[in-house]
């Protein structure tokens, strides 16, 4: 079946007729679903001309009290009774077929690419070779991307082939488009949504910031197909999210907690999901979401296509993979060993807690010599985040804070101010900053060191993205001594100069591989009191973000 043909021709020629029969035969009326999909749920759903518009609104989740919650249980799946669906759309381009095995291996070696599994498709080298339908290819070209990234070159053929797959690559390497574009092709091959239908594509993400960014990409590239999406996350009113689900969306991007809430209160279901994405799986597990992930995935038909994306490959992710992926193929860009990008200059200063504030200001003066610079500062706690921001603002630095105690509209506003450069200094906690993809961050400053080396690598990875250069400054105190050995190892691997003051912590921590240790006490901001914690009802700016600005430094 060609996916480059006009929609009208495809549908008027009944190329999807088999789907109509499958769904009209009451496949969803079996005990698995309690008869909620009656015999004619999809009757005539494929008739007529599609004309480029995905009609067939979902909706109608009624029949349950607003406050009624039903605990999710694992369905007993009978695959023979489920309607069949298409998931292999890959047709290898002649230029790709013509490449010899030695040429393929040379390409993979050049891009530090390793593949594991059976019958792995060859990588592509250009957008035209990917085999996308014209309506997807045109969207990509309109965005002006010069060529696919390494993960896209191998990830697209894998995803389009319908195989379960694992993609491991650094944050900022183009993973989102690696699953977003194939999902559009997948959706357009499925029957239209009917009343009461949930999404066809489900993307799980660890944080609301990352979920929103994924939604922006899906909206951008799904526009020509009129594919609808929604973003389901906590910390925001449920009303609009519920209305989106009731109207029907083909793509749902969600954080695990809020999605379970929507499922247990009957606001949506996962019966139609045939394309599942777990994005930043390592961070979701680090944040304790494994029980929620398992509960959600158990609600999805087991013959779905599952795509797992991660920046690292810890044992916990491997276990999840064995439990939920079927004969997966895997692509890794770079080393499986934890490593920092070689395009980032790492500077570590060993000092006392009382020296940190002065050193922070000195580094800000250096960073902002470039008037276009964006600086991301990490603190260990929400309180410290607010106190650093208040101090910087009083000293004339245009800083704003983002952390979990800020309301969602304020977090969105802070992120916009930072992205546009109106407030080029952002102070954040780890959870708030995870997944934030802001172009042009030139400096990352670890005012407080993280508790483990994985978080250090994730933090400094906010700069030096997509081949650009960046600088990461870390203020290291005696309280961080247990992190010393791993920090020295990361710096050496990236060919960075390890300061002599740090080497004594390397000897003290020799052989350590701290994964979840807290790295000793973190130290505090220095007894600054509790001011600046109010939420502020009069507008976006709460607490530290509403602190008065001194004479602006730059």
UniProtKB/Swiss-Prot annotation:
Pinpoint motif Q motif by residue range: 125-153
Keywords from UniProt, A to Z, are: ATP-binding, Cytoplasm, Helicase, Hydrolase, Nonsense-mediated mRNA decay, Nucleotide-binding, Nucleus, Ribosome biogenesis, RNA-binding, rRNA processing
Residue ranges constituting the Helicase ATP-binding domain according to the UniProt record: 156-331
| Motif, DEAD box: chain positions | 279-282
- Where is this protein found? Cytoplasm; Nucleus
**Annotated segments matching region Disordered:** 521-554
Broad class of the protein's primary localization: cytoplasm
One GO term (biological process): rRNA processing
Assembly and partners? Answer: Associates with polysomes.
This molecule's function is given as: ATP-dependent RNA helicase involved nonsense-mediated mRNA decay and ribosome biogenesis through rRNA processing.
Q: What is this protein called?
A: ATP-dependent RNA helicase DBP2
Origin species, per record, is Meyerozyma guilliermondii (strain ATCC 6260 / CBS 566 / DSM 6381 / JCM 1539 / NBRC 10279 / NRRL Y-324) (Yeast)
Q: Gene name?
A: DBP2
């Amino acid at each position: 079946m060609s996916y480059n043909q006009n929609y009208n021709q495809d549908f008027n020629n009944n190329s999807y007729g088999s789907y109509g029969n499958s769904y009209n035969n009451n496949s969803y009326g079996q005990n698995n679903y309690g008869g909620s999909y009656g015999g004619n749920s999809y009757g005539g759903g494929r008739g007529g001309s599609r004309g480029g518009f995905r009609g067939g609104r979902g909706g109608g989740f009624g029949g349950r009290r607003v406050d009624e919650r039903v605990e999710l249980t694992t369905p007993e799946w009978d695959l023979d009774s489920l309607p069949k669906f298409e998931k292999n759309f890959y047709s290898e381009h002649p230029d790709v077929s013509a490449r010899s095995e030695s040429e393929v291996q040379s390409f993979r070696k050049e891009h530090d690419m390793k593949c594991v599994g059976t019958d792995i498709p060859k990588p592509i080298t250009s957008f035209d070779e990917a085999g996308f339908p014209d309506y997807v290819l045109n969207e990509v070209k309109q965005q002006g991307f010069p060529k696919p990234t390494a993960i896209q070159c191998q990830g697209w053929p894998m995803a389009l082939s319908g195989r379960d797959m694992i993609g491991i690559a650094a944050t900022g390497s183009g993973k989102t488009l690696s699953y977003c574009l194939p999902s559009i092709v997948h959706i357009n091959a499925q029957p239209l949504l009917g009343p009461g239908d949930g999404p066809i594509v489900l993307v799980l993400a660890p944080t609301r910031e990352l979920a929103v960014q994924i939604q922006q990409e899906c909206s951008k590239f799904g526009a020509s197909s009129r594919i609808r999406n929604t973003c389901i996350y906590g910390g925001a009113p449920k009303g609009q999210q519920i209305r989106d689900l009731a109207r029907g969306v083909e793509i749902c991007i969600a954080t695990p907690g809020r999605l379970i809430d929507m499922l247990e209160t009957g606001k949506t279901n996962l019966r139609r999901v045939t394309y599942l994405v777990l994005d930043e799986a390592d961070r979701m597990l680090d944040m304790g979401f494994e029980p929620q992930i398992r509960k959600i995935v158990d609600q999805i038909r087991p013959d779905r296509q599952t795509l797992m994306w991660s920046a690292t490959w810890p044992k916990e992710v491997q276990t999840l993979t064995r439990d939920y992926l079927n004969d997966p193929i895997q692509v890794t860009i770079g080393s499986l060993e934890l490593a920092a990008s070689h395009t980032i200059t790492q500077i570590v200063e060993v000092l006392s807690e009382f020296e940190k504030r002065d050193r922070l200001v000195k580094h800000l003066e250096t960073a902002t010599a470039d008037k276009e610079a964006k600086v991301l500062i990490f603190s260990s706690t929400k309180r410290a985040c607010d106190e650093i921001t208040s101090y910087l603002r009083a000293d004339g630095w245009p800083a704003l804070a983002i952390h979990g105690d800020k309301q969602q509209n304020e977090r969105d506003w802070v992120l916009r101010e930072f992205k546009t450069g109106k407030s080029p200094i952002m102070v954040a906690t780890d959870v708030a900053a995870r997944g934030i993809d802001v172009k042009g961050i030139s400096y990352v400053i670890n005012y407080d060191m993280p508790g483990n080396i994985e978080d250090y690598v994730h933090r400094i990875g906010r700069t030096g993205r997509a081949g650009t250069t960046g600088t990461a400054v870390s203020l290291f105190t005696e309280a961080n001594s247990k992190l010393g050995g791993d920090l020295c190892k990361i710096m050496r691997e990236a060919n960075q100069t390890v300061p002599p003051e740090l080497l004594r912590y390397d000897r003290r921590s020799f052989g350590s591989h701290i994964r979840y240790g807290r790295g000793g006490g973190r130290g505090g901001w220095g007894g600054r009191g509790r001011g600046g914690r109010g939420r502020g009802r009069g507008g976006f700016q709460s607490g530290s973000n509403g602190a008065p600005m001194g004479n602006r430094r730059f």
